[in-house]
Amino acid sequence: MLTTLLQSDLPGLPLRHCGKVRDVFDIPHKRLPVDTRSGEYLLIVATDRLSAFDVVLPDPIPGKGEILCQISNFWFQKTEHLMPNHLTGINVASVLPDGIDKTLYTQRAVVTKKLKPVRIEAIARGYLIGSGWKDYQRTGKVSGIQLPDGLQEAEKLPDPIFTPSTKAAVGHHDENIDFDTTVKMVGAELAERVRDATLRIYHFAAKYAAECGILLADTKFEFGTDIDGRLYVMDEMLTPDSSRYWPIDEYQVGTSPPSYDKQFVRNYLETLDWDKTAPGPTLPQDIIDRTRAKYTKALQQLAGINID
């Protein structure tokens, strides 16, 4: 049975960060298994909050956090041969405080390594859509990458491209940046490692998704490093929050395809008289229900997991 969680409440676990969707807690050593107490770990909780245009909307999508967590875990396991990830395998229930309803958290939270975040959003695009399409219409480029003339909306790119952005605070907008700016922000060696990992994972995931009847139009990754400089993929992976998923049988060049992601909510919000700043508008129940159905469909079609 899916649960609903808008805000985490975990007495005894210090709240480290409250993001648009995820709440991140430090885990005191006394709550960790004895053989892991030499390390530093976090509890990351995927709530049912929904953000659009970098604004957290007031209405939760019931069960969304559980769906996101299960999709992420599926992809983390599927891609661990390509790139190490932040998961530890430590049982979530074992680190939760006593006296709470642990069933609210066990399917929507993970225990992870504590890493130093790379200060960019790592985006891979295989199709020309969204802000990439807008950039192309204006300049013929996306994040400084020159593309062929005459491409249409939603058209497949000759090759997937790496188009990073800044990591804005909650309520502020991410900004697309070119690779030279990325190098200035994080250094040449790390920028190249992040770019290579982003495109490597995208190629693998796009091929797998296509075999499931889904096009992976674009996706966003976050990376972090440990004290030895080893690079990990972290946060979430290939979820409907961080990716555009299109059903293959409804894909058509020249128009924005229907999707299994929150683009559906963005499209609804575009019809409103809203300036894309907080507070966000209330969502009708029909939009909430249809959004949940899209996320559920993505989980079932990609991972073969039925959830209700």
From Swiss-Prot:
EC number(s) per entry: 6.3.2.6
GO biological process: 'de novo' IMP biosynthetic process
Classification via Pfam families: SAICAR_synt
Keyword presence, NADP: no
Catalytic activity: 5-amino-1-(5-phospho-D-ribosyl)imidazole-4-carboxylate + L-aspartate + ATP = (2S)-2-[5-amino-1-(5-phospho-beta-D-ribosyl)imidazole-4-carboxamido]succinate + ADP + phosphate + 2 H(+)
Gene Ontology CC terms: cytoplasm
Top enzyme category: ligase
Pathway assigned in UniProt: Purine metabolism; IMP biosynthesis via de novo pathway; 5-amino-1-(5-phospho-D-ribosyl)imidazole-4-carboxamide from 5-amino-1-(5-phospho-D-ribosyl)imidazole-4-carboxylate: step 1/2
Entry-linked InterPro entries: SAICAR_synt/ADE2_N, SAICAR_synth, SAICAR_synthetase_CS
Gene Ontology MF terms in the entry: ATP binding; phosphoribosylaminoimidazolesuccinocarboxamide synthase activity
UniProt keyword list: ATP-binding, Ligase, Nucleotide-binding, Purine biosynthesis
NCBIfam families: PRK13961.1, purC
Family: Belongs to the SAICAR synthetase family.
Protein name per Swiss-Prot or TrEMBL: Phosphoribosylaminoimidazole-succinocarboxamide synthase
Organism: Xylella fastidiosa (strain 9a5c)
